[in-house]
């Protein structure tokens, strides 16, 4: 086939026109050593702290140590296929994770990839994993209640929206149970829940997911899982991934609740990373910035001012203690960062007081101003009564000849402790909690044996549901007990007293 001269010039013109001078420039480096989820890379001179790096096989990494001659990076994924001499690319982006409504109801890993087999997550919104917490001007004091559905907490250690309340205790004392009950109690409300599982067994996470599905709570819950079998970098980053997802709702005028279960394991993972990166160890071999690790995470939970959308992000971090030692390094750090703590005790747990909350050591520093007024009215004397009961019970062990007043106080205390017990996965609405505590405080349960109080409580709720639902509705709407409502409650309790037989 012959080509004429004018055609040649035409072809050349076309080629020149279509010629693209774009050359892809990527700054690359070479892995000089790798092991235990940490890679040292030579040649990435312009890398940023926290930058996303691209390893062979589509695996991501995060630049943590920027040294003179190399970069120390944590590999966010399986690193068995990566070897010395491999090429690593810069992405010029800080580590980001997907955020938005599309994540609700899903189970994702520490970098926001779905692991529940329900297909990809359809969202075009991404959030940076490391951002600064809102400043003072953007915040507002906590003033709305975050109901947990647990009588002992809502009455004596109330939590508000935007608060950080630590749940602390030994292993097997019901810490996760308190958190899961709080999630279940948000059903039908306007709170999006995020549960971050750090360093837990996969079977435990699967159990949590199935329990939440059973109670219809996955409809408003996101689960971020970095299980025990995953590398330390993923366990370290997962709480930041969770809080980034929560911030999306907070900044869009919505309310979110995030649970970190638990931050002790995140600190251990961070200690491992830091030691492998050759950062100098401090107390208990943790690095010097382990306080900052948790403070920058928990400061991102807050109540936002009306000008910024009036959203909120409430955090319930969990810390596991060893043999009740609250004065260890990580527990004291997190206690000082948070706005109060719920202390769970193994002695109480094994003696049948569940939730096993030690009322003397548990405190809520800001929740009082967020507590529902009706609850404040009935629970005002509760903490004092329980403290007096505990003191008397300690003395009563030594002597048997107690006067009548002391015996009555001990009997009342026993009944109060019994009333505050609650089975798992059965959160109670606020207005019903107010009723049972009102009955306990005003002596309506004093004449019944302690063993029959569980039945008294359930029958009382059934009685009010069936015959006094208008009073429950009034209490729910007014959120306070005025003289009129008080008279109605008293007459209803008197009516119930005639019907109930212990």
Curated annotation (Swiss-Prot):
Short name of any one Pfam family annotated for the protein: ATP-synt_ab
A GO term from the CC aspect: proton-transporting ATP synthase complex
Membrane topology: Peripheral membrane protein
Its EC number(s): 7.1.2.2
Localisation per UniProt entry: Cell inner membrane
Main localization category: membrane
GO molecular function, one term: ATP binding
InterPro entries on file: ATP_synth_asu-like_sf (IPR023366), ATP_synth_asu_C (IPR000793), ATP_synth_asu_C_sf (IPR038376), ATP_synth_F1_a_nt-bd_dom (IPR033732), ATP_synth_F1_asu (IPR005294), ATPase_a/bsu_AS (IPR020003), ATPase_F1/V1/A1_a/bsu_N (IPR004100), ATPase_F1/V1/A1_a/bsu_N_sf (IPR036121)
Record has DNA repair as a keyword: no
Reactions catalysed, as given in the entry: ATP + H2O + 4 H(+)(in) = ADP + phosphate + 5 H(+)(out)
Family annotation (SUPFAM superfamilies): C-terminal domain of alpha and beta subunits of F1 ATP synthase, N-terminal domain of alpha and beta subunits of F1 ATP synthase, P-loop containing nucleoside triphosphate hydrolases
Keyword terms of this UniProt record: ATP synthesis, ATP-binding, Cell inner membrane, Cell membrane, CF(1), Hydrogen ion transport, Ion transport, Membrane, Nucleotide-binding, Translocase, Transport
CDD domains: ATP-synt_F1_alpha_C, ATP-synt_F1_alpha_N, F1-ATPase_alpha_CD
Site (Required for activity): 362
Residues given in the record as ATP binding sites: 169-176
NCBIfam families documented for this protein: atpA (TIGR00962), PRK13343.1 (NF009884)
Family membership noted in the UniProt record: Belongs to the ATPase alpha/beta chains family.
Database matches in HAMAP family: ATP_synth_alpha_bact
Subunit structure: F-type ATPases have 2 components, CF(1) - the catalytic core - and CF(0) - the membrane proton channel. CF(1) has five subunits: alpha(3), beta(3), gamma(1), delta(1), epsilon(1). CF(0) has three main subunits: a(1), b(2) and c(9-12). The alpha and beta chains form an alternating ring which encloses part of the gamma chain. CF(1) is attached to CF(0) by a central stalk formed by the gamma and epsilon chains, while a peripheral stalk is formed by the delta and b chains.
Function: Produces ATP from ADP in the presence of a proton gradient across the membrane. The alpha chain is a regulatory subunit.
Protein name: ATP synthase subunit alpha
Organism: Geotalea daltonii (strain DSM 22248 / JCM 15807 / FRC-32) (Geobacter daltonii)
């Amino acid at each position: 086939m012959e080509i004429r001269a004018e055609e040649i010039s035409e072809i050349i013109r076309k080629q020149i026109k279509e010629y693209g001078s774009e050359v892809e420039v990527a700054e690359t480096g070479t892995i000089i050593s790798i092991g235990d989820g940490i890679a040292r890379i030579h040649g990435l001179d312009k890398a940023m702290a926290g930058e996303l790096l691209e390893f062979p096989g589509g695996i991501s990494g995060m630049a943590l140590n920027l040294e003179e001659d190399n970069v120390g990076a944590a590999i966010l994924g399986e690193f068995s296929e990566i070897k010395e001499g491999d090429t690593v690319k810069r992405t010029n982006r800080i580590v980001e994770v997907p955020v938005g409504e599309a994540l609700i109801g899903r189970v994702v890993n520490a970098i926001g990839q779905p692991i529940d087999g329900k297909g990809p997550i359809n969202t075009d919104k991404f959030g940076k994993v490391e951002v600064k917490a809102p400043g003072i001007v953007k915040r507002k004091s906590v003033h709305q209640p975050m109901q947990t559905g647990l009588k002992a907490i809502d009455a004596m250690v109330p939590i508000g929206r935007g608060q950080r309340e630590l749940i602390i205790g030994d292993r097997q004392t019901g810490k996760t149970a308190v958190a899961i009950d709080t999630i279940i109690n948000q059903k039908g409300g306007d709170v999006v829940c995020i549960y971050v599982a750090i360093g837990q067994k996969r079977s435990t996470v699967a159990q949590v997911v199935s329990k939440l599905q059973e109670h219809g709570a996955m409809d408003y819950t996101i689960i971020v899982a970095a299980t025990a079998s995953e590398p330390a970098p993923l366990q370290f980053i997962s709480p930041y991934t969770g809080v980034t997802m929560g911030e999306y709702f907070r900044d869009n005028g919505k309310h979110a609740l995030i649970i970190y279960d638990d931050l002790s394991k995140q600190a251990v993972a961070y200690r491992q990373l830091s030691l492998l990166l050759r950062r100098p160890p401090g107390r208990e071999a943790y690095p010097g910035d382990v306080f900052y690790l948790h403070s920058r995470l928990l400061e991102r939970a807050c109540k936002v001012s009306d000008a910024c959308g009036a959203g909120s992000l409430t955090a319930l971090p969990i810390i596991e203690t060893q043999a009740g030692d609250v004065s260890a390094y990580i527990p004291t750090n997190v206690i000082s960062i948070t706005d109060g703590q719920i202390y769970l005790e193994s002695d109480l747990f094994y003696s049948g007081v569940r939730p096993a909350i030690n009322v003397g050591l548990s405190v809520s520093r800001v929740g009082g101003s967020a507590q529902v007024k009706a609850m404040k009215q009935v629970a005002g004397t509760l903490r004092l009564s329980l403290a007096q009961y505990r003191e008397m019970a300690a003395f009563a062990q030594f002597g048997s000849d107690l006067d009548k007043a002391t015996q009555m106080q001990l009997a009342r205390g026993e009944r109060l402790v019994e009333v505050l017990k609650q089975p798992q996965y059965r959160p109670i609405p606020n207005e019903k909690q107010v009723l049972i505590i009102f009955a306990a405080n005003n002596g309506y349960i004093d004449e019944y044996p302690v063993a029959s109080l569980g039945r008294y409580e359930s029958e009382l709720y059934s009685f009010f549901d069936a015959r006094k639902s208008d009073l429950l509705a009034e209490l729910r709407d007014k959120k306070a007990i005025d003289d009129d409502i008080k008279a109605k409650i008293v007459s209803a309790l008197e009516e119930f007293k005639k019907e109930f037989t212990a």
